[in-house]
């Protein structure tokens, strides 16, 4: 059962992204009004805006939290061609704001010559690393060598993807059997260029990222991409938001002992859903990777789950105002797909409906 609650976000323009922190007790929103807002959940379940500030000189496309072991740290990216890192600090005893927290900019990353379209922190086992992608087709990976000094970031890798980039996702697996892997989606509207999703893997011998796979069947613009939590699986699961929702299974092939190159992947399409009957803008997994949420231009959030027969189907539809759509269950995905059956989502799911200035909150 999902209960929706509207939040008067008070943004002056479209909300482009909403992001929970690790514990689900804080969230951040960003907007074309060039601002980021931070929200804290009170004990009675209400969300209160505890910080709001102008972050960029253009639309802010994405905002994301670092793992809390690195402190209260946010990153944002913008049409103004920059990404920024923000840290919350608490006033010192001799400070006029003693005991009060406020957010300060630690650094601005200015390497991109075009709009920075996505920003993501790497999985925490890799250290404090930040990845950006931009409309000129370049993915950049930065590292903070000293986690106590977030004003210093060094550019570690640049990956040229040829196509304009719209979204990135790190494979969260911390297994030593899996090298660091990142998926990149493109919103290039030219369907003559097939393969709008590219997978890159870190190669230890060369100390560089190499392309291991291009998903050639994805020919339409990709708006979002999300690796599922790994949970010890030997394979990877990747969800893609394009003109529909797709779930791919990426199976690493056994390496030859003499091979020093990137891992070869066997790609299987697990499921494909056109239930939105429109462009899909966001996909998000629950923490156990048993439930996938998607939001689209139909103004609905749809929930997808694999049953005990490993077939994916729609288990719920919520309108932009949070009200359920009758007859939601039973919309199956094609083809039949392997997945991990499990209980309902154990995390909150939050979607910002495109074109709205309110965030819709749907705890479950």
UniProtKB/Swiss-Prot annotation:
GO molecular function terms listed in the Swiss-Prot or TrEMBL record: structural molecule activity
Residue spans of biased composition, Low complexity class: 327-338
GO cellular component terms, A-Z: GATOR2 complex; kinetochore; lysosomal membrane; nuclear pore outer ring
Localization of this protein: Chromosome, Centromere, Kinetochore; Nucleus, Nuclear pore complex; Lysosome membrane
Alphabetic keyword roster: Cell cycle, Cell division, Centromere, Chromosome, Chromosome partition, Kinetochore, Lysosome, Membrane, Mitosis, mRNA transport, Nuclear pore complex, Nucleus, Protein transport, Repeat, Translocation, Transport, WD repeat
Highest taxon of the lineage: Eukaryota
InterPro entries per UniProt: G-protein_beta_WD-40_rep, Sec13/Seh1_fam, WD40/YVTN_repeat-like_dom_sf, WD40_repeat_dom_sf, WD40_rpt
Comp. bias regions, Basic residues: 355-364
SMART domains associated with the record: WD40
Regulation: The GATOR2 complex is negatively regulated by the upstream amino acid sensors CASTOR1 and SESN2, which sequester the GATOR2 complex in absence of amino acids. In the presence of abundant amino acids, GATOR2 is released from CASTOR1 and SESN2 and activated.
Residue spans of the WD repeats: 10-49, 55-96, 111-152, 160-210, 217-258, 275-314
Any one GO BP annotation for this protein: positive regulation of TORC1 signaling
Primary localization class, coarse: nucleus
Annotated Pfam families: WD40
Region (Disordered): 326-364
Matching Gene3D superfamilies: YVTN repeat-like/Quinoprotein amine dehydrogenase
Stated family: Belongs to the WD repeat SEC13 family.
Functional summary from the UniProt entry: Component of the Nup107-160 subcomplex of the nuclear pore complex (NPC). The Nup107-160 subcomplex is required for the assembly of a functional NPC. The Nup107-160 subcomplex is also required for normal kinetochore microtubule attachment, mitotic progression and chromosome segregation. This subunit plays a role in recruitment of the Nup107-160 subcomplex to the kinetochore. As a component of the GATOR2 complex, functions as an activator of the amino acid-sensing branch of the mTORC1 signaling pathway. The GATOR2 complex indirectly activates mTORC1 through the inhibition of the GATOR1 subcomplex. GATOR2 probably acts as an E3 ubiquitin-protein ligase toward GATOR1. In the presence of abundant amino acids, the GATOR2 complex mediates ubiquitination of the NPRL2 core component of the GATOR1 complex, leading to GATOR1 inactivation. In the absence of amino acids, GATOR2 is inhibited, activating the GATOR1 complex.
Description of how the protein assembles with itself and partners: Component of the Nup107-160 subcomplex of the nuclear pore complex (NPC). The Nup107-160 subcomplex includes NUP160, NUP133, NUP107, NUP98, NUP85, NUP43, NUP37, SEH1 and SEC13. Component of the GATOR2 subcomplex, composed of MIOS, SEC13, SEH1L, WDR24 and WDR59. The GATOR2 complex interacts with CASTOR1 and CASTOR2; the interaction is negatively regulated by arginine. The GATOR2 complex interacts with SESN1, SESN2 and SESN3; the interaction is negatively regulated by amino acids.
Name the record gives this protein: Nucleoporin SEH1
The organism of origin for this protein: Osmerus mordax
